[in-house]
Amino acid sequence: MSELRLSSEKRLRIFTGRAFPELAESVASELGITITPTSAYDFANGEIFVRFEESVRGSDAFVIQSHAAPVNKQIMEQLIMIDALKRASAKRITVVAPFYGYARQDKKHRGREPISARLMADLFKTAGADRLMVVDLHTSQIQGFFDGPVDHLFALPLLANYVGSKVDRSQLTIVSPDSGRVRVAERWSDLLGGCPVAFIHKTRDPLVPNESTTGRVVGDVQGKTCVVIDDMIDTAGTITKAVDALFNEGAKDVIIAATHAVFSGPAIDRLKNSRASEVVVCDTLPIPVENRFDGLTVLSIAPLIARAIREVFEDGSVTSLFDGHS
């Protein structure tokens, strides 16, 4: 025999950190596979240890970890998992970060500040990641920080289709909470039949995080059902002020729609006490039972992530998942 033929069969493996294993289980279920068994625990001093219980040699590995609080711990655990996979000879390693930590630190607002979103990308690459898969980055330019392919998925169709099924589209106005997300609002409008778009002019002090001053509403919202859209809800200050501003301008109803439910600090109380009739989010982050309330709707992001993983594994196309029109 003059040649040795190797098996060309590819092996897809899903791995999960401890931040949100329920999401990873849902993704694996959509793919019809199980999660690779992993041992992970903290030493007494807080250091993280990870070991995979099965061979990963030659596998196409997808490491799912949402960067929920405590953010730094979840990121470090994912980095350690990537390093372990690299040293165990995984063929390709894809970081799946449904919520990408430090995404708001994507540029320097003033001198002597870091660009932490870039540092994150460098850390993943150094650890051994070949590819990055994320959902609704705070700003799209973060894709350029990673030296390799980036699959930037959009939850917009999922959110828009849900909202569109609940309201009279002829009475709908899509509202951006600031001028920076008007383009996203326009894409919502396209998906929902060309409904009007408005935005709220606001100012923010770069020295005071999580605080903004809501200004005037730009656009006609009188008698309309308004959908305030954003990529995340952190302390909910911006978005609840937007709700108040819309009602002050004569809006008939307001729905809040956002991808990432960070829900820090006073967020739950603010949302519970807001005049919005419904808050719609995706499960890119875990939402504890105590943070759930009447009027909160949580949509599953697992089918979108599973579809993207399948396309990447099978060398298919994920373009429709990038452009937000899937």
Placement of each model-derived feature along the sequence:
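PRPP-associated nucleotide enzymes
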Residues: M1-S326
